[in-house]
Design a protein with these regions (language model features):
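Metal-dependent phosphoester-hydrolase catalytic domains
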Residues: 87, 149-155, 164-240
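Short, solvent-exposed loop/turn segments at secondary-structure junctions
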Residues: 14-16, 44-46, 82, 116-119, ...
Length: 240
């Protein structure tokens, strides 16, 4: 392991579960990534690598999971113990946004694990009380409010399903602009032209990025997810 770098990965696993062929292959892919910090969205704990330390954002994102009680919108796996774990419990970020800290070989790191709502969240399904993009924008506001309270001496990594392609594709300009405003304090390492992109699963931080690698949402046996996954190698500024 390179003690000067931190490996961070994220993937939306499209509710892979149980002992199905897809779930087995998804779990294998997550293991092969060998990340230090792993954010899995739309997943469950049995997909995560063995060992490590796990936190999730809870079950209250406004959809009934009675028949699938192990589902989580946002899961965080860490090679090292997690502290200061907190999840949003109100608003659009409830069950979707999780913050934690860990002490890695590169030093203390804060993680913001997210599954920002997609455009139609709670519009015609779930609570049915939202308008297009309203949940997404509210969640962005909540992430911004969290970030304003962060100790700037501790590096921050934001990872998960952002539900936007960057640069903007089809989303309204106001939605793209709002995400850019929220992310302005960090560098979005996964924006632009990358293999298997453009991505909506992203990693941003105030660390330096030395590597971005993606994998597709399918393998030789078929579909794994409707998202591509991504891993970044990060290091403190001025190291190496």
């Amino acid at each position: 392991m390179d003690n000067t770098e931190l490996t961070v990965a994220t993937w939306n696993t499209m509710w892979a579960s149980g002992s199905t062929s897809r779930a087995v292959r998804v779990r294998s892919r997550l293991h092969e990534v060998d990340a230090d910090l792993l954010v899995v969205t739309e997943g469950q704990r049995d997909l995560l690598p063995d060992g490590g330390h796990v936190a999730d954002a809870g079950t209250h994102w406004g959809y009934d999971i009675t028949s699938q009680p192990h589902r989580r919108k946002t899961l965080l796996w860490s090679r090292w113990p997690l502290t200061e774990v907190a999840a949003l419990t109100t608003g659009a970020g409830a069950g979707r946004v999780l913050t934690a800290q860990t002490l890695a070989p590169v030093g203390a790191v804060r993680v913001v694990a997210v599954c920002i709502p997609w455009a139609s969240a709670h519009v015609s399904t779930g609570r049915r009380d939202a308008t297009t993009w309203s949940e997404h924008l509210e969640c962005c506001d909540q992430i911004e409010q969290l970030a304003a309270q962060f100790d700037p001496r501790i590096p921050t990594v934001v990872a998960g399903d952002f539900n936007q392609r960057v640069p903007r594709r089809r989303q309204p300009l106001r939605v793209s602009t709002r995400l850019s405003e929220v992310l302005a304090r960090w560098t979005l390492h996964t924006a632009g032209e990358v293999a298997h992109g453009p991505l909506i699963d992203h990693i941003a931080s105030d660390l330096d990025c030395t590597l971005v690698r993606t994998w597709p949402g399918s393998d030789e046996e078929g579909r794994l997810s409707d998202h591509a996954g991504v891993v970044c190698a990060l290091r403190p500024a001025g190291v190496g």
